[in-house]
Amino acid sequence: MASAAPDAPSLAAAQKLAGSWSQTGQVEKAIWGLCQGSGSKPYQAIVDLSGPAYKCSCPSRKFPCKHALGLLLEWSTGRVPVASQPPDFAAEWLARREEKAAAQPAPAAKAVADPATAQKRAERVASGLAELDLWITDQIRGGLASMDTSWEALDGVAARMVDAQAPGVAGALRSLAGAVAGAENWPDMVLSELVRLHLLVVAHQKMDRLSGPLRDSVRAHVGYPVSTESVMELPAVREHWMVMGSRITEEKRLFTRTTWLLGRAAGRWAILLDFSHGSPNFSGVVPPVGHVVDADLHFYPGAAALRARLGTTHADAEPFTTLPPGNIEAALQSYTDAVGADPWLRSWPVVVTDVTPSYVDGSWFLVDRSGEALPAEGDSRMMWTLLGISGGYPVSICGTWNARCFEAFSVFVNGQVMAL
């Protein structure tokens, strides 16, 4: 059940609910129960095992919440009895899920791209990027010390990029505003991003001279759309994919689920991105963290292809108990290789084994047995949780490296992956 938890504290909280359950039950593909909290009314928790999907009446923003996790723990230990039918609160939610699944429209006929429309968009993008490059030049000439790095200023430039149909560039500018807020080394961060964006503008101007994969990368970073249908038509990569981590984020009620996969045989990384507006109820089904699945992945085109879509699965997912080796040197080299292929990448997933989380003079590091260290960053509670899980001993950690710091998304302890 640990693989379903959004983080270690949620799992710990779920384990404390063992004596709080009543009216639990299960049918073939669902479990439910009432969990008494601090209020007068117990929380109603439901898990659709076929998803899995979760529902709870509590106000928690974590997904799944501790009540859904606690219900799964009750079920896994055999304390949820079989019932003839679910109660009304569970039956209604399950029925709505079935109706939603049945109402999924049939695949539409593949639309043929209009060359005139594509050309018009390319011209709008080119015009917008030319304005962006002029703005970048003005910032460099005026000096970064006088640059307005406020959210309002950068959001104004980002809005212009949205109008120019370059949402990838707009997202980079908005992310920059959040990154520089309060950062001591913000001039270095700003300069690096401005250089990256200038290089993207130049590459877009000379796309006809680029190789096919690099041209695809430029289009992806600018924000040209790629249809799901076209991706699924690309050759599949069949592997035993290990689910190394999963994280749900939210921005303006848009929930994004990122799932990191690692091919057991070839060591190739992939990420799956799923989106849901209003609530974290994702339609796509992915194997839980800590499981390996024999499946096909279809990768989005690019010079360092990483994002993919899940295709045919050839067997049920099952837990894995070992990780491939991965030291700090190999992690840095894999990042270097990826950026060498796609210079606009900001981070790359890596595994580092036998490293110890260390807190030194207000900063976090991952230190291997030879004394080599990687600077690490992340939410303070998450980093202290990581240290607590390790117990001060070497562990294997999965995360992303961005040339500046390592950000963990899971830890491997005693043959089990725990999401952070």
Regions found by a protein language model. Give the residues of each.
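Long, low-complexity, compositionally biased intrinsically disordered regions
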Residues: M1-L420
